[in-house]
Amino acid sequence: MAKAKIAVNGYGTIGKRVADAVRAQDDMEVVGISKTKPNYEAAVAHRLGYDIYAPAANLEAFEKAGMPAAGSIEEMLEKADLVVDCTPGGIGEKNKPIYEKVGIKAIWQGGESHPIAGFSFNAESNYEQAVGRDLTRVVSCNTTALCRAISTIDRELGVNKVRASLSRRAVDPNEIKKGPVDAIVLNPVKLPSHHGPDVRSVLPHINITTAAIKVPTTLMHVHTVNMEVNKDCTAEDVKNIFGSQSRIRLVGQGITSTAEIIEFARDIGRPRHDMWELCIWPESITVTDKELYFFHAVHQESIVVPENVDAIRAMMELESDGAKSIEKTNKAIGLYNK
């Protein structure tokens, strides 16, 4: 079977990770990545051997910078079977008419709203519904985390209600123009936050309400989660359920902070210290009268990356079984949980 030809439109925090993850698979390949300016990220892409495409008006700038572009973004799209749009939130919506004109399958990120594709994706929750689709939205880092945790418990115990409080990192590490630096920001002030409805775009039967704040850190998000379940269980039962999932990591051995999780990722040799798994503190898991509580941490730069690969595989009909795709993706990128 020929490899699926994938274009990555936008080579920033998510795009560069998606490109590397796609390149690691044996059933898909990157035909090109796009950058608007010949900056350091474009230089790295050039050094890594990616064909760079740029807006037609900017091609000369890339030539002068010593990293000649392979062509325009439209030319990149013509070579691909599917485009993964990793542009900043709001830009993806503007790109949709271009994709429609070319007649290419497209994936957007969680910075866009659900209606852009009419379908929101999480591999553990609704992989099979994505098979053969032309348009898909991979949900955000926070929604991906909640969907992983909720769908895992829902399959085994049944979830009646979820209440979650999100402490969101302020910005990614390379975003020097944003904050807060010395403040905790209500985000949003009006409750509930948008994360609950976003979870329901994937798991429509879940009763969930969320609240969110921004805190002055760049490393990870942390959620405090309360679930009301339908079956009797113990904390040990919940640990075993979470521990059975390849994209959930139980973090212990003295780890009590996001800084230590990132250091652990560095120590085990993860590229860019990425932590693709949802990290749950097993000591925090508490069960009282069919209510369970726990903390989990979310590496916002990388948790959605394997999800994008699985979405490609489903949409291109390379694999109809979600569990098999997850296993294949994990193995290729080096996600070994245990």
From Swiss-Prot:
Name of the protein: Glyceraldehyde-3-phosphate dehydrogenase 2
Gene3D superfamilies for this protein: Dihydrodipicolinate Reductase, domain 2, NAD(P)-binding Rossmann-like Domain
A single GO molecular function term of this UniProt record: glyceraldehyde-3-phosphate dehydrogenase (NAD+) (phosphorylating) activity
Pathway: Carbohydrate degradation; glycolysis; pyruvate from D-glyceraldehyde 3-phosphate: step 1/5
NAD recorded as keyword: yes
Reaction equation(s) it catalyzes: D-glyceraldehyde 3-phosphate + phosphate + NADP(+) = (2R)-3-phospho-glyceroyl phosphate + NADPH + H(+); D-glyceraldehyde 3-phosphate + phosphate + NAD(+) = (2R)-3-phospho-glyceroyl phosphate + NADH + H(+)
Binding-site positions, D-glyceraldehyde 3-phosphate: S140, C141, N142, H195, G196
InterPro entries: DapB_N (IPR000846), GlycerAld/Erythrose_P_DH (IPR020831), GlycerAld_3-P_DH_AS (IPR020830), GlycerAld_3-P_DH_cat (IPR020829), GlycerAld_3-P_DH_NAD(P)-bd (IPR020828), Glyceraldehyde-3-P_DH_2_arc (IPR006436), NAD(P)-bd_dom_sf (IPR036291)
E.C. number: 1.2.1.59
Protein keywords: Cytoplasm, Glycolysis, NAD, NADP, Oxidoreductase
Record's subunit section: Homotetramer.
Protein's GO biological process: glycolytic process; lysine biosynthetic process via diaminopimelate
Major subcellular location class: cytoplasm
Record field: transmembrane: none
Active site annotation, chain numbering: C141 (nucleophile)
Family statement: Belongs to the glyceraldehyde-3-phosphate dehydrogenase family.
Organism encoding this protein: Methanosarcina barkeri (strain Fusaro / DSM 804)
Binding-site positions, NAD(+): T13, I14, G111, R169, Q300
